Amino acid sequence: MTPDQNALVLSFLLTVGGLIGYLRKKSKVSLIAGTALGANFAWASKLMERGSSQGINYAFYGSLVLLASSGPRFYKSRKPVPMILTVLGVISTWYFYRLWA
C-alpha cells in the first residue's frame, strides 16, 4: 500500500471508531476526536496523492497526536480500545516518521 492509502485507511478507522464510541457510549469526545483525526488523515492522504510533501507532515503529526492521546489512557485503564489506538499510534508514527525524516 502507498502512504496515501495508509493515511486513508487510518482516516476511515478513526472516523468509524469515533462514531461507534458515540453511538455505544454517547461519548462526544470520541466522536469529535475520531472525526477530527480522521479528517486530518483524509487531508494528508489527499495531499500525498497530489504529490505534496505536506501530506507526510500532516500524517506524522496526526499519528503523534493519536499516540499521545491514547497511550496514557491505555496505561491507566488497560482496556482494549485504548490498546488498539495506542498500537495504531505506534505503528503509524513509526511508519510516517520513516517517510518524514
UniProtKB/Swiss-Prot annotation:
Transmembrane stretches, start-end: 7-24, 81-100
- Give the membrane topology: Multi-pass membrane protein
Could you confirm whether the keyword Membrane appears in this record? yes
Chief location = endoplasmic reticulum
**Pfam families named among the record's database cross-references:** Tmemb_14
A Gene Ontology biological process in which this protein takes part is: mitochondrial transmembrane transport
For the keyword Membrane, the answer is yes
Subcellular localization, as worded in the UniProt entry:
Endoplasmic reticulum; Membrane
Quick one: a GO cellular component term?
A: membrane
The alphabetical list of record keywords is: Endoplasmic reticulum, Membrane, Transmembrane, Transmembrane helix
Q: Which domain of life does this protein belong to?
A: Eukaryota
Give the matching InterPro entries: TMEM14, TMEM14_sf
Q: Which family does it belong to?
A: Belongs to the TMEM14 family.
UniProt protein name = TMEM14 protein homolog P14E8.05c
- Originating species: Schizosaccharomyces pombe (strain 972 / ATCC 24843)
